[in-house]
Regions:
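Positively charged n-region of N-terminal signal peptides that target proteins for export
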Residues: 1-4
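General helical structural elements
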Residues: 7-8, 106
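Bacterial N-terminal signal peptides
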Residues: 8-17
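Carbohydrate-interacting regions of secretory-pathway proteins
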Residues: 20-230
Length: 230
């Protein structure tokens, strides 16, 4: 996460109002709850859009991040009451990225999702950036402490599954629960201005993949969603 803050605090109230008004009619995650819907086709970035510096390409069937900090988001609409399946690896052991969820409106720049959505962090060694375990892989960035440390070394494939169940967010990493959070749970004080604003997030929001910097190369092999069983 780059260490700067450019979003006005006054905008937060507007986004929270949007979050409160969200309902199931906005949810585009529909279909068979027993079948994953692949939203990355393995060939190109159809259905995705990039905002902010840097970008993403598809190489050998994988999304590859370039430069940053920016965000590649899925344009189909908001999702909630669903599961998100992501398979990724890092080029090196300590590369940085994240899976963004609960983004209240369609992004037009890179910082709104940071402050008003949630980032499920990808960073195996936050201590190398003078950050603590609240900033490690599988955490809601700066908000949750790991229930377990289940990441594989950076160049190995990792499987992340994120459950959005109302306001509750559960993160499974390689089959191990590492995060279980719902609105209202206690969170630590903000230490840096680049950390997200505190407060509720929408039950239904956009999702995206972060490209962090020139030195942080992450590859995504699968991105899929399916609705929760009712």
């Amino acid at each position: 996460m780059l260490k700067r803050f450019t979003v006005s605090i006054f905008v937060l109230a507007a986004f929270v109002s949007l979050a409160v008004a969200a309902d199931e009619n906005q949810n585009v995650c529909k279909g068979d709850p027993d079948k994953w819907q692949q939203i990355f086709n393995g060939k190109d970035l159809t259905g995705w859009k990039h905002v902010g510096p840097g970008g993403d390409t598809v190489e050998d069937g994988l999304i590859r991040t370039h430069g940053g900090m920016g965000l590649l988001y899925w344009t189909a609409g908001k999702i909630g009451n669903c599961m998100i399946h992501v398979v990724y690896k890092m080029r090196d052991e300590n590369d940085n990225s994240g899976v963004f969820i609960r983004i209240p409106i369609e992004p037009r720049e890179e910082w709104m999702p940071v402050h008003y959505g949630f980032e499920v962090q990808i960073d195996n060694h936050p201590e190398k950036s003078d950050e603590d375990e609240y900033h490690s892989t599988g955490m809601l960035y700066s908000l949750t402490k790991p229930l377990a440390k289940a990441w594989k070394p950076g160049p190995e494939w990792n499987t992340m599954e994120i459950t959005l169940d109302g306001s509750r967010t559960i993160v499974m990493l390689n089959g191990v629960k590492v995060t279980d959070y719902k609105d209202g749970d206690p969170v630590p004080d903000r230490k840096f201005d680049f950390e997200p604003q505190h407060g509720p997030r929408p039950n239904f929001g956009y999702m995206g993949l972060q490209n962090h910097s020139d030195n942080d190369i992450v590859f995504f092999k699968e991105v899929a969603i399916k609705p929760l069983k009712k």
